[in-house]
Structure formats: C-alpha cells, structure tokens
C-alpha cells in the first residue's frame, strides 16, 4: 500500500491518496476526501494498463465536481421527491437540489474528509460520523466504507454503519466506468448486460419513479442480453427522451433476497476488458453519463457527455415515499451492512 498527498482542501486540510495493488498488475487509488474511488488500473489484452474510471488529479477537482466521479454517496443515494419524507409520523425536510433531494443534497458525504480507520496492502477503511439532523436526516449515524482489491481482480466496496435512531440509509458508489480507458471518449460502443427484467419508469425529467415496475421486454430498456450502450439510446422512446438517455433504476432478478449476486456485465472489445458487477441490494441505477458537465479530469483529459457509465447499487429511488417498495430504513441498534463488487476480467 502506498500513501501520498492528494492536495489541500479549501479549508486547509490535507487530503491523502491510498494506492492498493494485486499480484496481477491491477491497482486502485482511493482518497479520504469523500471516500472517492480515484483510479482503477487494469491491464488490457496487450498488457497495457488502462485507468477505467473518470476522476481528478487532486482533491481540488472533487471539491467542485457536480458529476460525483467515484463518489461515496450518503446518507441517501439518488432522489427523494420534494426533498422530504415521513418516518414514524414525523416529516423530515431535506435540502433541495434539482427541486428534489438528489444524493442527499449539496452537503453530501462525498464533499467531506473522512477518517482512515485502517489500511493495509489490500484494503483501506474510511470512517465518518454523521450527526443527528445532518442533511436533515434523524440520528447519529456512524458509517465505514472499506475498499478491498483482491487477487481475483475484484474491487469490493463494503459499507457498515449504525444509528441511535431509526433513519434512512441508502448508500452507493458513483464511479463512472469507461472500459477503454478514462481518456477514450464515448462509451456508446461498449456493451452491457443487466440482470433485470423490470425497470422503474420516471414521471418526468426530474427522474422520480412512478412506482410502477415495468417490463423491459420489447423496449430499448432491455439489456437482458448483450447490447451496445448506444444501440438504442437515441430511440423514439418516451422514457429515454425524459432523461436524455439511460438514467433509470432497474429491479434486479435476485435468486435469494439479500445475497451478493451478479447485477451487470460490461465489456469493451477494443481493450479486451470485461467488468462484472455484483451486489446484495435489490436494484441498480444505470446511468449513461448523459449530463456529464464538460470538465478537465485526470492527466488533462477532457470529459464530456457519455464518456463514462455508472452502475449504482441501491434501493428503488424515493422508496421511502412509495407504497409497496422495500424501504431503506435502518432501525436504531441494527447494523447497515451491504457490499458491491466490481470484478475485472482481462
């Protein structure tokens, strides 16, 4: 494990970068600022290492990043309608962004300096204390995020937390993948399989789900067999028009509820790199990077629309306000414990 400086935050605190490697030539780097996944170096079919996630060279880029490159999102990922929810008869008001609450508002966990609990050659654990009322959520919530790089070429992200009151917790990682390399431009020729026969249609461009679980069959939302991301992204289909391309929740076909199972397979023919994604959560948000704001990232590379895609494990967005959905409620004294894995084949 290598530790080095990653720049200084706006309030004068030093951020650190931790680099892990395995026996097969893979490397990942993570930072204590926002518990971001900064880089994932994977050997391609010719043995050349490619960095397959978008990001920045120092903490400065992450402080102003609105796309959440590589971010640990908390307490709640995705959207809560009207930036409010009710729990045990009490209404909790959250900060509004985009007229709802997206990724827990402007003061997300990805804009904070985390503590490092432990670090070794294969894993780093970051810890954050989120006080009662933080972002509008109830309860003192202590959470850890552990990044592990295995010799099976898997990046494991394990979340563990507890709270002294019942609260909402729905954390995720917002990495943008480009299996040709972060500097390779469009991801539309890369292929995807999603283990999901249903998706969550949205009401309008604000991307709040209707509450319906709609079949993907016969629609451009069908990724049950391998398909290029760009094959139907511009189709004359209302759901894609509302969100400028894919940015939808998919309900995973789970064999056993709560078990870690395959959720997606993405591949790039040009690099020869394949990524398998696994989670124990019920859903995944597939986002094709439709609204990546033009920005200069790592090594001076210019990022733009659809230069990376996200596979964000989660509960159904706005489930806390939806009848009939599994709600992301962590009860006082219980342990929040979930794992998402991105495994690379090369």
Q: Each PLM stretch: what is its role?
A:
Residues 1-346:
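An exposed, glycine/acidic-rich loop-and-rim segment of catalytic or binding clefts
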């Amino acid at each position: 494990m290598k530790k080095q400086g990653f720049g200084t935050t706006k309030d004068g605190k030093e951020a650190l970068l931790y680099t892990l490697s395995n026996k097969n030539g893979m490397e990942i780097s993570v930072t204590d600022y926002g518990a971001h996944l900064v880089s994932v170096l994977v050997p391609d079919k010719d043995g050349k290492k490619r960095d397959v996630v978008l990001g920045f060279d120092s903490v400065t880029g992450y402080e102003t990043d609105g796309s959440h490159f590589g971010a640990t999102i908390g307490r709640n990922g995705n959207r809560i309608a009207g930036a409010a929810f009710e729990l045990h008869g009490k209404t909790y008001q959250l900060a509004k962004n985009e007229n709802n609450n997206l990724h827990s508002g402007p003061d997300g966990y990805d804009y904070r300096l985390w503590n490092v609990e432990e670090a070794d050659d294969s894993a780093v654990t970051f810890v954050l204390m989120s006080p009662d009322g933080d972002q509008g959520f109830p309860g003192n919530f202590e959470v850890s995020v552990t990044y592990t790089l295995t010799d099976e070429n898997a990046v494991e992200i394990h979340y563990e937390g507890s709270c002294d009151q019942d609260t909402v917790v729905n954390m995720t990682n917002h990495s943008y993948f480009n299996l040709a390399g972060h500097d390779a431009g469009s991801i539309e020729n890369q292929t995807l399989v999603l283990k999901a026969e249903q998706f969550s249609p949205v009401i309008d461009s604000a991307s709040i789900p209707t509450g319906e679980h709609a079949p993907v069959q016969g629609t451009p939302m069908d990724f049950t067999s391998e398909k290029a991301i760009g094959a139907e992204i511009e189709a004359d289909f209302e759901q894609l028009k509302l969100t400028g391309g894919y940015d939808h929740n998919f309900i995973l076909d789970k064999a056993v509820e709560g078990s870690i199972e395959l959720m997606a397979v993405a591949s790039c023919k040009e690099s020869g790199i394949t990524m398998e994604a696994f989670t124990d959560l019920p859903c995944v948000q597939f986002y094709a990077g439709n609204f990546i704001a033009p920005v200069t990232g790592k090594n001076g590379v210019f990022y733009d629309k659809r230069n990376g895609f996200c596979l964000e494990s989660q509960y159904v967005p706005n489930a806390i306000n939806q009848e009939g959905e599994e709600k992301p409620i962590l009860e006082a004294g219980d342990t929040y414990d979930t794992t998402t894995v991105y495994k690379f084949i090369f």
